[in-house]
Amino acid sequence: MADTDGTPDMAKGIKRPEDLPGLTLLQDEQTSFIKPPVNWAAWFKVAGVDVDPSDIPGPRFNQADHPVNAALSGAGVLMGRVSLTETALRDGRLVMPFDLSLTSGATYRIVCPEGAEKRPRIAAFIDWVTSEVAATKDLAAGRRFVA
């Protein structure tokens, strides 16, 4: 989860998960196909915050980068995918105010014809993707992941 209102200083006003209802919560509809769900309703449930899912305020986006851009513009609070927010998290434009994260169980795979993974250009691509994914792992250090 990441938060910004033009500056990470907004996170200083968010001390507990119970502080989030009533704020503008940016919603990524592209996660609706993921089971278990990775959305505000699921996050509030595991955080122990009693919120009616139909009462969760905020715009819904059907392109994954749109809620990220909205958060970066100060439009609300984002439950973001680390893969899409890594740079902004590292440079401080977005912050993770809580140690609780949802795990989706969704995975990405590289698929190629058998043996093609040994070709130099494909092997280099696989190595690059693997290193990029590994670089996001340290952002998860010390976080509680709940399915």
Regions from the PLM with identified roles:
Residues E18, V68-N69, A123:
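Alpha-helical segments flanking ligand/cofactor-binding loops in enzyme cores
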Residues E29-S32, P59, E114:
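Structured beta->alpha junctions
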Residues M1-D28:
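Flexible hinge/capping segments at coil-to-helix
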Residues L26-A47:
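Secondary-structure junction motif
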Residues V82-T87, D91, S101-A147:
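C-terminal effector-binding regulatory domain of bacterial HTH transcription factors
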Residues G6-R16, F33-I34, G115-P120:
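Short helix-loop capping/hinge motifs at secondary-structure junctions, enriched
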